Curated annotation (Swiss-Prot):
Record-linked InterPro entries: LOR, LOR_sf, Tubby-like_C
UniProt function note: Might be related to the phospholipid scramblase and tubby-like superfamily of membrane tethered transcription factors.
UniProt similarity note: Belongs to the LOR family.
UniProt organism field: Arabidopsis thaliana
Name of the protein this chain belongs to: Protein LURP-one-related 9
Lineage: Eukaryota, Viridiplantae, Streptophyta, Embryophyta, Tracheophyta
Domain of life: Eukaryota
Length: 197
């Protein structure tokens, strides 16, 4: 079982989701996450132009499940930290994600769970998970690198009209016993990183 946010987000069957992104204003964007029956599962909101690009993933009732933000004010590469709830305390760190290569045109991330020791420097730690993206859009596959196990796949439904309007969607397929809240958080981070290229 791959449980990062919580076991309640690990289904014993393949989970398929639809994620719709829309720009609410020049400063804010929102992601709505639905199951295939069109039931709202999560929302993600946050500012595009705030200093740390903070995003909050909430359940359908509006309760914060996790918060995402960039590490540092002007990063050379995009480093993200993800915390439980609306916290930014180091003891609530769920995982960190960073681009493995600054000069790559593909959107890929190395994802690291917090180390057992008190140090939060993940620069020399091997990633626990990796995403591999495409050259265009925010599609990616999530792998567990030691056994090269595919955990999830995200497909960006790219259209030029959606790009101009600032709204588009994703299809998400998460394998059994894999935390789908974790995958949605990686989708938001990947999309944000891809949009800044």
């Amino acid at each position: 079982m791959v449980s990062v946010v919580g076991e309640m987000f690990c289904n014993p069957y393949t989970t398929e989701l639809v994620v719709r992104r829309r720009r609410e204003s020049l400063k804010r964007e929102r992601y709505d996450v639905f199951d295939l029956s069109n039931n709202l599962i999560f929302t993600v909101d946050g500012g595009i132009w705030n200093i740390r690009r903070k995003r909050v993933l909430r359940d359908a009732a509006g309760i914060p499940l996790l918060s995402m933000r960039t590490k540092g004010l002007v990063p050379m590469r995009y480093n993200w930290e993800v915390y439980k709830g609306d916290s930014t305390e180091s003891d609530n760190l769920l995982f960190s994600a960073r681009e493995p290569n600054l000069l790559s045109f593909k959107t890929s991330l190395d994802v690291t769970l917090p180390p057992d020791q008190s140090s939060t420097d993940i620069s020399s730690v091997e990633p626990d998970f990796q995403t591999f993206g495409r050259y265009i859009g925010s599609s990616f596959k999530l792998f567990e690198p030691i056994h090269n196990t595919l955990l999830a796949e995200v497909v960006h439904d790219f259209t030029w009209g959606g790009l101009i309007k600032g709204s588009y969607s994703f299809k998400v397929r998460v394998n059994p016993y894999v935390d789908f809240a974790f995958v949605v958080a990686l989708l938001v981070i990947t999309d944000d990183t891809s949009n800044l290229r």
